[in-house]
Amino acid sequence: MDDSDDEYSRSHGETLTFVDPEDDGVSIGNTQDSQFAYEQFSVPTQSSQATDLLPGGTDGTTNDLPFHDVEDDESDSEKSLTEEQHEQKLPEHACRYCGISDPLCVAKCTVCRKWFCNSNDGTSGGHIVHHMVRSQHKEAYTHKDSPCGDTQLECYRCGSKNVFNLGFIPGKKDQVVVIICRTPCASIAFQNDDNWSPEDWKSVIAEKQLLSWIVNVPSEEQVARARKITATQAVRMEELWRDHPEATVDDLNKPGLDREPDHVQLRYVDAHHYSKVFRPLVAIEAEYDRRVKESASQAVGTVRWEQGLRQSVLAFFHLPQFADGVMKLAKGDELRLKHSQTVDGSEWTKIGSVFKIPDNHGDEVGIEIRGAVDKSVMESRIMFTVDVVWNATTFERQYKALAALLNDSKAISPYLYQKLLGHPAEEMMLKFDLPRRLSVAGLPELNSSQMQAVKQVLTRPLSLIQGPPGTGKTVVSATIVYHLVQKTEGNVLVCSPSNIAVDHLAEKIHKTGLKVVRLCARSREHSETTVPYLTLQHQLKVMGGAELQKLIQLKDEAGELEFKDDLRYMQLKRVKEHELLAAADVICCTCSSAADARLSKIRTRTVLIDESTQATEPEILVSIMRGVRQLVLVGDHCQLGPVVICKKAAIAGLSQSLFERLVLLGIRPFRLQVQYRMHPVLSEFPSNVFYDGSLQNGVTENDRHMTGVDWHWPKPNKPAFFWHCSGSEELSASGTSFLNRTEAANVEKLVSKLIKAGVQPHQIGVITSYEGQRSFIVNYMHTQGTLNSKLYENVEIASVDAFQGREKDYIIVTCVRSNDILGIGFLSDPRRLNVAITRAKYGLVLVGNAKVLARHDLWHELINHYKSKEMLYEGPINALKPLNLALPKATIRTKNNIAGNANRFGIKRMQYTFNEYKSNDPSQPRLPPTYSNSQNLLSMSKLAQTFNKNVPIPAHMMDPNVYAAARNQKDRRRGDQRRPPPQAEAAMDLSQGMMSQQSQQYPPQGASSQSQYLLDGASSLSGWSQSQTTTTTTRHHHHRQNRNSQQQMSQDMDDIQQKMDDLLFSQDC
């Protein structure tokens, strides 16, 4: 298990649990994990064959691999055994994966009573640990003949049996160790006994195996004689055991056991084909979500009761599984509270909506129960149990949207229908008289790239806007909506997959003076929101009329109405809701809520979807199956993508957003290019690596100098540094996440020092990719922090996902991963790194093990950047000293690629810019310029024209009869070695927008054709910008191979220069 063990809810920042992405098998899904190769991220695998299905699996393995028994060599006369005979011969305590039965090497899962060995052959950890992670069984029992004897592993103080939370410390007597849980017992012991320190505690699990003095690791000879099992098979066994506990490995080979769904495609024949692909994926995701939610039942003990508003009752309780990261909740989710301690033994049950989840202010979960609760229940000490109520509404709406696409010809315009399916459609422009002034009162003035995006979007039926961090995409979206309202009949619908993003955009649009209604799902009408004054519920109370207002007040006071009054209330409410929605200029809601029945009669022809790269295609479909004629998608495919919890669905392509697919089809996004968030020092690395050096700084160093704060950075005028620390990682109590106690202690030191320096706690954010680390830091600050625990409550400690789209003045990133062999998991995803290091305005601190992280090429580049800028340090916080570290050679390639300046660390690119063609060194990074004087439109236009020459060369300007050949990756060289620029692009079917590698063929030796150029191909989405047309794969090669082709192409460069100048001139006009 790796970081895919940690995933997070995009709406409220709570986490979703994922398991072991470094295993090769299909497991709980994580769409932003290192298991996805960079081709799947930047140009998904289907792009290599635009009309073919995606290849199955992530690692080339099949799902029906048979097991092979190893013959027993002890007796020459013994014949090989069949699988069935082998199973019959094995003793009860044999490993259920591989069959190893040495009592010294096995342990029993106390929950399911199955035995497993401590070998990691075929899996990323010991078989017993792998089983406990996958099944979420957390208790183990050693064999009577094992080193520890017949023993239940448990804490000697509290009796906790959670193996993932157990460790040991030296006993006060020689040759004795004490098994004790990490929290709370070890923490208490360290505080009360000076003879013990936190460094003395060691986990009983190291490198995902039980320590050998507890359960021996099988020898190489034992492993060689055992049944061979792959990670895929182990995962499938765990899934099979959920419904069939007595299943054996033979059952894996039964036909039809695990049919893989069809993969998404770049293009679809028709709506029937589209629906046939996506309906099974939605069904798989829905079933998996249901299973996960309904299996999350646990005892919560006693409940604390309070009287709420509107005659509701509030129930507060502790959820141990939430603290462990097993149960995932978001505000608005429904929980079922129940007990069986009634007089007649019947079950008492109530359903409530979650309004509070554990945070820095407290570790209780709070639910609001509508209606009365018997006093006898509230006053008795009853032991309650909690279940999660699964809500199928979201998936049902996706089914209906797919059906509408199939059956309703009026559900979407013919043009958008063709674009959705990937068919060629004649480009069209909408009739729209552009206003003389594009900037809107109440919003900041637009810069040049923002103006260009607004102009283009208003006149097109389909537009994509890419908004890198801090570039003001919310301002641009609000401006677009304002102008659309002035020219469009009916409402403009604004959607996002995230409630937080909807609230933020609704607030920004409201500042323009438009009438905005924030439509919430009925289950969330009483949930917290940052724009309560815009909600439909609030506007009903204010503008609903005297009779309706009276009934609303009566309902709030009494909790419910009499039958006659309730009918009248519902009638008046429906009429008034329709009036308010019909009269609104803009309706804001989530993508799912766009299918709310209250919108069924509202005419909407224009839809803008914010954060569209975080939504799956069926989610987007829900928003647009309303007869939509104009669609604007806003997002950034270089940041986090959709959350898909079922890995099988994610691998099949459900995790690819519509935004990404449209880019692959040749629709050019308009990229915003001026960032207003980060100090220029902080923006340099993400600009060069993730955005091809295109980000300009709209703020200066002086703008990002914090006054009134007594904080001194190790390197003056450089508000960032990497703090190297070598503490070891540990599995968290959930078994599906990680924590690093050394880094947590250093984070507390940094936070405390910032607060002492005058920084307000709410200005500080701590980012981690691991729920285990987040939970540990929160607890550590409250129990062992040097300042008053109240001061830490307003320090936000959250996941990367929770911080996307947001910012803080100071950001601390704790990397957590520190091991010798297991890799860095989540951290290998460049999109996560991009989000994490682009949240800070004034200062950024990275805390991690530089030696371990530098083995990965992208982190090697980041750490080398910090080292070159003299921002790499080690030592105590008050005595930091430069780290003189010889960085190890990066041995792990980036799998998820969004590299812009790709040649710097060997990542392919889809295209090169015209300036790179003209220059002789495309590998030279372009530093982000400072974008000054935003009020001078003439200088803005001139600068934009100059800067926009850094765009990919349109394919039609190149010779269409070009051959391309891939160069061996081993021939790549890092450093400052100069390479010739590419001289041509691969052949391409422009009418279809095909990016087929079939057109890239090796030319015959000695061919004299002028189109005989060897080019270096690539696949990255990050280089697409507002000046881009349909691009194809380009390839450049070694000097000696290219010398002749350079001479052949030189005569065409002047013509290309003139065509590019004409293109840029026409765009600027």
Swiss-Prot record:
Cellular location(s): Cytoplasm
Span list, region CC/SHH/C: 109-137
Biased composition (Low complexity): 51-65, 991-1013
The Upf1 CH-rich domain, residue ranges: 87-244
Substrates-to-products reaction catalysed: ATP + H2O = ADP + phosphate + H(+)
Residues annotated as binding Zn(2+) 2: C109, C112, H131, H137
Region (C4): 155-185
Post-translation changes: Phosphorylated probably by smg-1. Smg-3 and smg-4 are required for phosphorylation.
Stretch list, region Disordered: 1-86, 966-1069
EC number(s) recorded for this UniProt protein: 3.6.4.12, 3.6.4.13
Region (C3H): 95-127
Biased composition (Polar residues): 28-50
GO BP, one annotated term: embryonic genitalia morphogenesis
Keyword Cytoplasm among UniProt keywords: yes
Keyword Metal-binding: yes
GO cellular component annotations of the record: cytoplasm; nucleus
Binding-site list for ATP: Q450, G467, P468, P469, G470, T471, G472, K473, T474, Q639, Y676, E807
Biased composition regions of type Basic and acidic residues, renumbered to the chain: 77-86
GO molecular function: ATP binding; ATP hydrolysis activity; double-stranded DNA helicase activity; protein phosphatase 2A binding; RNA binding; RNA helicase activity; zinc ion binding
Effect of G472E: In R895; loss of activity and increased phosphorylation
Disulfide bond positions: none
Gene3D superfamilies: 2.40.30.230, 6.10.140.1240, P-loop containing nucleotide triphosphate hydrolases (3.40.50.300)
Pfam assignment, any one: UPF1_Zn_bind
Family: Belongs to the DNA2/NAM7 helicase family.
Known function: RNA-dependent helicase required for nonsense-mediated decay (NMD) of aberrant mRNAs containing premature stop codons and modulates the expression level of normal mRNAs. Is recruited to mRNAs upon translation termination and undergoes a cycle of phosphorylation and dephosphorylation; its phosphorylation appears to be a key step in NMD. The formation of an smg-2-3-4 surveillance complex is believed to activate NMD.
Name this protein carries in UniProt: Regulator of nonsense transcripts 1
Record organism: Caenorhabditis elegans
